[in-house]
A protein has these predicted regions:
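Short amphipathic alpha-helical segments and helix-helix/interface helices
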Residues: 5, 59-60
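Anion (oxyanion) recognition and catalysis
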Residues: 6-9, 64
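Generic structural hydrophobic/aromatic packing signal, biased to beta-strands
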Residues: 8, 15, 70-72
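Short, well-ordered alpha-helical microsegments
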Residues: 1-2
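A glycine- and Lys/Arg-enriched "phosphate-lid" helix/loop adjacent to the NTP-binding pocket
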Residues: 10-59
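NTP-dependent small-molecule kinase module
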Residues: 61-108
């Protein structure tokens, strides 16, 4: 998708990225199980774990450096909380340093 981001920017679009983070792969699996119980589609546990880590790696390694604006939101509880936001040429605002550190650790 990095190519798509660059192509859109080349056509004058401003690209915003909103990353909804869950605080553990376990919670991601629980959310999928809940969805399945309501008739939704399943995703195997190993795929959830792989995508959880890879998604965070891609967030920091590919997308944050190229999108115009980004934000990371903790979607673990009913009330969503902003973790951090920034963008090209903007100062990064960190609202929860502990959560941001935890997210980065999962991506290693």
């Amino acid at each position: 998708y990095a190519t798509l981001v660059h192509r859109a920017q080349g056509q004058g679009y401003i690209v915003h990225l909103v990353y909804f983070w869950l605080n553990s792969p376990r919670l991601a699996k629980e959310r999928v199980a809940d969805r399945v119980s309501q008739g939704g589609h399943n995703i195997p546990a190993d795929v959830i774990e792989r995508r959880y880590t890879l998604g965070i790696r891609n967030l920091f390694g590919i997308f944050i450096p190229i999108v115009d604006e980004w934000m990371i939101i903790d979607n673990s509880l009913l009330r969503q909380e902003m973790v951090a936001e920034g963008g090209m040429g903007k100062t990064i605002k960190v609202y929860d340093e502990n959560k941001l550190t935890k997210i980065k650790e999962y991506g290693k």
